[in-house]
């Protein structure tokens, strides 16, 4: 029997769950939910279990592109959803949203939340390969986000507008937030240091993460004689 108070988080990387969704999972548990976590295997799994959450390993890779492996991931999620019968699944990051959304519909999960903080390189890259991938991924998003009882959480309007143009989201599904937030109990506000201003790019050094734009901003600031350290 489906339990309306059974909540399953699906995240690709166990370390990402701890860094980005742990407070939410703990708050849900404090509110009376039976919280489960599904991720791929990794060294952070024991930390999740040690915090009292039921953990389930799913066969998923962050960047794998082998069709049979990807289908295996979808089917593993379908079986997990049918076995656990959660009342709500919370899907985080690209593959869990795509595969978990499809699996939730196939397994008859009553409610779904999909958290989208970015759409990946497919939607920013150029060339024929990227265009073909965009078409395929667009169809997957329409399938994954077509759940009748769902909310799609966005952190920026650009991602929302892309998926809206694809016909993947309905206006009543959309929830906008300003970001994942910061735990001020761990990261306290401190006074701003004296000049010069220091700007830090907190991202992987990839083209689609904005490295070129960051370098260009540094060039323009230097050209204008502004005292900013990048």
Describe the residue ranges of each PLM region:
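Active-site proximal beta-strand in glycosyltransferases
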Residues: 6-8, 104-123, 151-153, 175-177
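N-terminal strand-loop element at the rim of the active site
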Residues: 11-69, 176
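A short, basic/aromatic alpha-helical/loop segment that forms part
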Residues: 17-19, 183-185, 206-211, 224
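Donor nucleotide-sugar binding/catalytic pocket of nucleotide-sugar-dependent glycosyltransferases
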Residues: 56-59, 134-189, 198
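Short His-centered aromatic/hydrophobic patch
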Residues: 91-97, 116
């Amino acid at each position: 029997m489906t339990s309306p108070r059974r909540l399953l988080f699906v995240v690709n990387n166990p370390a990402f769950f701890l860094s980005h969704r742990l407070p939410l999972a703990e708050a849900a548990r404090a509110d009376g939910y039976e919280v489960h976590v599904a991720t791929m295997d990794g060294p952070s799994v024991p930390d999740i279990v040690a915090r009292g959450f039921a953990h389930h390993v799913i066969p998923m890779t962050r960047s794998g592109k082998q069709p049979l492996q990807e289908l295996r991931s979808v089917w593993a999620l379908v079986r997990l959803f049918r076995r656990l019968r959660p009342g709500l699944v919370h899907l985080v990051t690209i593959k869990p949203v795509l595969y978990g959304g499809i699996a939730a519909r196939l397994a008859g999960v009553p409610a779904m939340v999909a958290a989208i903080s970015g759409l990946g390189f497919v939607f920013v890259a150029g060339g024929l390969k990227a265009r073909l991938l965009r078409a395929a991924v667009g169809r997957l998003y329409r399938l994954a986000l077509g759940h009748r009882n769902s909310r799609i959480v966005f952190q920026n309007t650009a991602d929302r507008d892309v998926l809206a143009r694809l016909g993947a989201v309905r206006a009543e599904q959309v929830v906008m937030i300003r970001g994942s937030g910061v735990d001020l109990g761990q990261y306290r506000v401190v006074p701003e240091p004296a000049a010069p201003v220091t700007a830090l790019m907190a991202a992987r050094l990839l083209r689609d993460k904005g490295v070129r734009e960051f370098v260009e901003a540094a060039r323009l600031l230097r050209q204008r004689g502004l005292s900013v350290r990048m």
